[in-house]
Design a protein with these regions (language model features):
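A charged N-terminal "starter" segment
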Residues: 13, 156-164
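Active-site beta->alpha loop and helix N-cap motifs at the rims of alpha/beta catalytic domains
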Residues: 1-37, 41, 75-78
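Catalytic alpha/beta core domains of metabolic enzymes, predominantly
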Residues: 29, 41-134, 140-158
């Protein structure tokens, strides 16, 4: 079976390597069997493309409480289709509490506020692109500061346009 073979190969790359396994295959079939098999071989796993607490629950039923597992919940992509990822992540964190070897990851950050949401929920890991990190560094500005900066930006834009009335 190709995915298993690839996972075993990737695992040889180093001690800190986590092997990514999708929660389902391209046909939508849950990958519980391969997750269980690799987990029992003490291979560190990152179960990816997770969206629901129900999927997290199925993953938890397939693993032991020793081998390290990251459950990557695609919060940003859920938001992209109008779904609130927060309840699913909250439930997933609660379900995984008894598993000291499991970490919940907030994947596909779309805006700086996601960082605050992930932190408040108790996510163990959040993947943040550089463009969002730059914005997070601006946290703490007052609304008054933001207003002035915004209006200054409007002034600069209007001067650049050379538009006269």
């Amino acid at each position: 079976f190709n995915m298993k073979k690839q996972a075993l190969q990737i695992n040889t790359w180093g001690k800190n390597v986590y092997v990514k396994i999708p929660v389902v295959n391209s046909k939508g079939v849950f990958m519980g069997k391969i997750i269980k098999e690799l987990n029992n071989k003490n291979i560190k796993l990152n179960i990816t493309a997770v969206y629901t607490a129900k999927q997290t629950q199925r993953i938890l039923k397939s693993i032991n409480k020793k081998s390290k597992v990251i459950v990557s919940i695609f919060a940003g992509r859920a938001g992209d289709v109008g779904k609130d990822p927060v309840p699913e992540i909250k439930k997933s964190i609660a379900l995984s509490k008894k598993f000291k070897n499991v970490e919940i990851l907030w994947a596909s950050v779309r805006e700086p506020y996601n960082y605050i949401q992930a932190k408040q929920l108790g996510c163990h890991i959040i993947t943040v692109p550089p463009s969002i990190i730059e914005k997070i560094e601006k946290f703490g500005k007052s609304f008054e500061q933001l207003t002035k900066e915004t209006v200054r930006g409007f002034l600069i834009d209007s001067k650049k346009s050379k538009f006269k009335i």
